[in-house]
From Swiss-Prot:
Its EC number is 7.5.2.3. This is Beta-(1-->2)glucan export ATP-binding/permease protein NdvA. The gene is ndvA. One of its GO terms (cellular component) is plasma membrane. It is found in: Cell inner membrane. Residues 21-311 form the ABC transmembrane type-1 domain. It catalyses: [(1->2)-beta-D-glucosyl](n)(in) + ATP + H2O = [(1->2)-beta-D-glucosyl](n)(out) + ADP + phosphate + H(+). It comes from Rhodopseudomonas palustris (strain BisB18). ATP binds at G378, A379, T380, G381, A382, G383, K384, S385. InterPro entries: AAA+_ATPase, ABC1_TM_dom, ABC1_TM_sf, ABC_transporter-like_ATP-bd, ABC_transporter-like_CS, P-loop_NTPase, Type_1_exporter.
Length: 604
């Protein structure tokens, strides 16, 4: 994306503030005209005081300098007041719009598919969000406070200078050409270099975030020095790339300062020669020196503007790349909110592929009736998780249809669909907020009594009550202030509060010890009552009582039946069971069931 297109898009993001933007632009136009009244009036006053020797296009017949001085004061007051008003409203516009864009960006990335987040580091997304919105804020603020007025000033100044004295105006044009050529060359030379610098900034942010997110691993394996050295290496590489860019722009500063000094001297030299020939007045020489000073100031502002756009361009490009990422699924224009569903789930000839070559799910068909528990088993990559992801529309199938209560899930709003589906993940996901806040994710308006009931049913109330702050206890980052079992039981309580007709359990007890697993299983039994439940199972012991088990291989269901039926067939499932020593333990487990029930009752 070219810098011109990039900057145009920056201005287009003003959106609802466009009206104020046009008002500020008009105010800047008035300022651009008013600013040149000062050098013109200054020159005319000098001519009047020196005996009305003006010979240029702006000859004056005013005999007294006082009217000119009064006009100068009036223009000065207008410039001061208008500049203050522009600065005030530009500040407010930039701050309001930065917060609006930041919120919009956050909402956008939260809607992007899990595959996008899997392949993109969260630290990088945070860096892009903060640096991108800060860059937008700086450009908006600079544009309306300085840069636009500077550009308009150049548009006004050069024709005015030609009108007053074209001979002296040529010197100003030469100065503009030097600035333009030099800036263009440096931008062309350093544009790709600055892009590499921003890539290093992203790597630095991602590496630091990665290390901080795994600080326990770093400390336990004595990797602090290694991580610091790695970060220092990235920082050194960043500086090595940044220094040449800074050197080029320092060269621009040196050459432009030299050019401005030479231009002022040239105006005096040419002006004196013209004055001796009667082609200009002392006032016009003074006026053009003021023009040159003002032109230099505006050119430096324009160069600063170009430099700021250039330096911000890679950050903005990265920001827009994220903003342009398209969510995998969206609401259809005619999508409906289904309110509460019953939970009749039907897959009909469903196929889906991530890469368009190898099917992740192929011709999948099955029905889950309300209240049934459907277990999905199979090797990693067999298609279990993909099938469930299609159910709650993380993706849409390339062929086939998924219906709930006879309604195509694609005809439902995403919010309405997902409100009817609860998920208990293998790793309990908690916010760094209070226990109450984490529970209310399931039901935002839940009362304390409802939370207590849900926590009790999920075997979580005891440990909540033991903490000093009870439901106000902070769970810590990713729930690290709680044990694995406590986190999982809170996750189950959250699902109970949500009270969805369809429940997804992603091997919710795989990482727990036996005692904790017993408590969590009791909680799971409670949350599964009366719901259509899908269990993604790796440990076959957890699905012994499932209504039906679907065995996946290469994206297809190769076996289907109850636990005992599949064992009796001596097929793929039976082989999996033997690998997990299930067959030998089946009779023993059946005999021990009453004892387990009694033990569970005692634990609860």
């Amino acid at each position: 994306m070219s810098m011109l297109r990039l900057y145009t898009r920056v201005l287009q993001l003003l959106g609802g503030e466009a009206r104020l933007g046009w008002i500020l632009a008009f105010a800047n136009l008035l300022l651009a005209g008013a600013q040149f009244a000062e050098p013109v009036l200054f020159g005319r006053i000098v001519d009047v005081l020196s005996g009305n020797l003006s010979t240029g296009a702006l000859q004056t017949s005013v005999a007294s300098p006082w009217p000119l001085l009064g006009a100068w004061v009036a223009f000065g007051l207008f410039t001061i007041l208008c500049s203050a008003a522009v600065a005030l409203h530009a500040d407010r516009l930039a701050h309001r719009q930065r917060q609006a864009i930041l919120t919009s960006y956050f909402e956008h990335i939260m809607q992007l598919p899990l595959t996008y987040h899997t392949g993109t580091h969260s630290g990088r997304l945070m860096k892009v969000m903060l640096q991108g919105t800060d860059a937008l804020w700086r450009l908006w603020l600079g544009f309306f406070r300085e840069h636009f007025a500077a550009i308009l000033s150049l548009v006004v100044l050069l024709p005015l200078a030609l009108y007053i004295n074209w001979r002296l105006a040529i010197l100003l044009f030469i100065l503009c050409v030097v600035f333009t050529v030099l800036t263009t060359l440096v931008v062309h030379k350093t544009y790709s270099m600055q892009g590499e610098v921003e890539e290093q900034y992203s790597d630095l942010s991602a590496r630091a975030s990665d290390a901080l997110g795994n600080v326990a691993l770093v400390q336990s394996f004595v990797r602090i020095d290694a991580e610091v050295q790695g970060l220092r290496f990235v920082a050194d590489r960043l500086l090595a790339l940044q220094m040449p860019v800074l050197s080029w722009w320092a060269l621009v500063t040196v050459i432009t300062r030299a050019s401005t000094t030479i231009t002022v001297l040239a105006i005096f030299t040419v002006g004196i020669a013209l004055h001796e020939q009667g082609l200009t007045s002392v006032g016009e020489i003074v006026m053009f020196v003021s023009f040159a000073t003002l032109l230099i100031q505006k050119l430096e502002q324009v160069v600063s503007f170009i430099n700021s756009v250039f330096m911000e361009a890679p950050r903005l490009q990265e920001f827009f790349n994220v903003l342009d990422a398209v969510p995998a699924v969206r609401d259809r224009p005619d999508a409906v909110d289904p309110e509460r569903l019953q939970g009749l789930v039907e897959f009909k000839d469903v196929s889906f592929s991530y890469d368009g070559k190898r099917p992740a799910v192929a011709d999948l068909s099955f029905t889950a009736r309300p209240g049934e528990t459907i277990a999905l088993v199979g090797a990693t990559g067999a298609g279990k998780s993909t099938a469930i992801a299609l159910l709650h529309r993380a993706f849409d199938p390339q062929s086939g249809v998924i219906r709930i209560d006879g309604l195509d899930v694609r005809d439902l709003t995403l919010a309405g669909l997902r409100r009817n589906i609860g998920v208990v993940f293998q790793e309990a996901l908690l916010f760094n907020r209070s226990i109450a806040d984490n529970l209310r994710v399931g039901k935002p308006d839940a009362t304390e009594e409802e939370m207590r009931t849900a926590a009790s049913r999920a075997q979580a109330l005891d440990f909540i009550e033991r903490s000093e702050q009870k439901f106000d206890t902070n769970a810590g980052e990713r729930g690290r202030m709680l044990s694995g079992g406590e986190r999982q039981r809170l996750s189950i309580a959250r699902a109970l509060l949500k009270d969805p007709p369809i429940l997804i359990l992603d091997e919710a007890t795989s990482a727990l010890d036996a005692v904790t697993e017993a408590k969590v299983n009791l909680a799971l039994d409670e949350v599964m009552k009366g719901r259509t439940t899908f269990v993604i199972a790796h440990r076959l012991s957890t699905i012994r009582h499932a209504t039906r088990i679907l065995v996946f291989e290469a994206g297809r269901v190769i076996e289907s039946g109850t636990f005992d039926e599949l064992l009796a067939r001596q097929g793929h499932f039976a082989a999996l069971a033997r690998a997990q020593f299930m067959v030998q333990e089946t009779s023993r487990a059946n005999m021990a069931a009453p004892l387990e029930h009694a033990a569970s009752a005692k634990i609860s």
